Amino acid sequence: GTPPLAEVVFVPKAGYTGLARLNYTGTDKNGAEFSGVVEITITAPTSSGTFADVGANYSWAAASVDYLYRAGVVTGTDATHFAPAQNITRGDFVLMLYRAFGLQNAGTASFADVPQDSYYAQAIAAAKAMGIATGGGGGTFNPTSPLTRQDAMLLIQRTINATGGSLRDGAEASLSTFADRGNVAPYAQGAVSALVQAGIIKGDNAGRLNPTGSLSRAEMATILHRVLTM
């Protein structure tokens, strides 16, 4: 027969609230068919159920932080803290992509500035082998440097495409509503446009992309949550 309903997990799209109706059919252990409807009311949490520092001020990120924590994509800075305002580094972001997408360890060659015994070395080596992480000049990756928003978008697009998905470069016109669209570097233009068109990137309350700005851990969580549930 089919699995009991208690064993079925429903994952709503990031940011969704309201009533979800799920029609189901199945067979019991004797082969008899059954069907029905499950109604689930989805509400937005006001704080994290795991981390004390993801409270009312970060209610917009709470569901995403908890989702990624349960999925094994992120960890806290300790058992009860997430440090949501802390800027995420390039190395840490690649590690989260590695966990989120199950990147394969296709190689051991990494970058000159990534120590082999660092906690993100395996993730960066895999990302390099898959063409996701290309680094900068001189064979370096700058893993401890803050990640810019446009570089995060480029890494996400490459990861999706390298793992069987398809996220083509978007149209430049999709950025027309953002006041700072001219600040997007040419190398990231297609990726930024693609993520905007897909609804993953929405900009800030002032209508800006802030492409060269850093990305906080809370912002990272909301973006990755949207990517994984889109």
Protein language model regions, located:
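Short, structured beta-strand segments at or near domain termini in extracellular proteins/domains
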Residues: Y24, M220-T222
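Feature responds to low-complexity, polar/acidic, surface-exposed segments characteristic
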Residues: T43-A62, R70-A71, T75-A123, A129-M153, ...
